[in-house]
Amino acid sequence: ITSMEVSAELGGRILDEFPDASVDVHEPDLTLSVEIRDKIYVYSQTIKGAGGMPIGTNGKAMLLLSGGIDSPVAGYMIAKRGVKIDAVYFHAPPYTSDRAKQKVVDLAKQVAKYSGPIRLHVVNFTDIQLYIYDQCPHDELTIIMRRYMMRIAEHFAKESRCLGLITGESIGQVASQTLQSLAATNEVCTLPVYRPVIGFDKQEIVERSWEIGTYETSIQPFED
């Protein structure tokens, strides 16, 4: 039996049950869809899901997770392609508070609703940050700190048998995210660095964060 024959048979039976109904194949008020598998499934509404691939089918990667808007979205997007993620957060007390750390823990839990369980590594970055501040040119502080973060993240990634790093960087969004700056941070890594939101503008990232439910947590006023 063909799909056209199924349509004709089911359509006829529906019209028998509802004689006041009529068929309009061009502008229908209601479209009924039918899937025949082990059983017959009839439905009138299709709800779009996240799509993507089963978690873990494309290996594992390490997400550099902050309390901002971008990195949770990056983690979600790479997880949607079947990549299992772990995460690393750089905490710098007393310059960042315990509430800031809790915000990142909460974000990891929110992303984990889509990605499956996330192992979160919390790194005390204060001593390294102060050393860089004392010893390095101040106009290069951000890039140098970022290079240290990438090295540390790669250490945890290799321990966890991850196949790459994930960041929420987007070209030109801030001064430290020019192509030259991204190349400078890449230089310290031997693993590939994946940047799922690299071509997004800020509004596009914000919209995606609303969709996945991380936006309200990300904008909580705790420095990360």
What do these predicted ranges mean?
Residues 86-88, 195, 218:
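Short hydrophobic alpha-helical runs that function as membrane-insertion/retention elements
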Residues 9-18, 46-58, 129, 135-207, ...:
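Active-site adenylate/phosphate-handling loop in enzymes that bind or generate adenylated species
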Residues 171-173, 221-224:
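Small/polar glycine-rich anion-binding or flexible loop at a beta-alpha turn
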Residues 84, 163, 215:
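Residue-level detector of anion-binding/catalytic polar loops
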Residues 68:
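Conserved G/P- and acidic residue-centered "switch" motifs that form tight phosphate/ATP-binding loops
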